[in-house]
């Protein structure tokens, strides 16, 4: 299992959601409104103060998915959320040691 997190531009969410849902085996996602700024080293000195004090609205997507669909999900995010400018966002993938889906779990069956 993998956890895929992405920070994207809000305007990209509707199309991205549609494309992700068309992936066979797509498990669903959690979407949150967040704010962020680019790294200071990526900014010109003229824009640095404004960029560090004026956060930009973004969307964070979180997906827990089987390994088999991870690359398809990441590729779909890149293909549909990128505009080629600073501030496009970020994607990161981490290993999940264990995931317990509440609706599938029998009480007491998790080995606590």
Q: What is each residue range found by the language model?
A:
Residues 1-112:
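Positively charged, small/polar-rich N-terminal and surface patches that mediate targeting and assembly
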């Amino acid at each position: 299992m993998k956890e895929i997190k992405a920070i994207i531009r809000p305007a990209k969410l509707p199309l991205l959601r549609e494309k992700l849902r068309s992936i066979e085996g797509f498990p669903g996602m959690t979407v949150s409104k967040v704010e962020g700024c680019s790294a200071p080293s990526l900014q010109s000195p003229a824009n640095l103060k404004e960029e560090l004090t004026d956060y930009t609205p973004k969307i964070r997507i979180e997906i827990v998915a089987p390994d088999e669909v991870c690359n398809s999900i990441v590729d779909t995010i890149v293909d549909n959320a990128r505009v080629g400018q600073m501030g496009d966002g970020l994607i990161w993938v981490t290993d999940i040691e264990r995931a317990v889906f509440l609706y599938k779990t029998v009480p007491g069956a998790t080995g606590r």
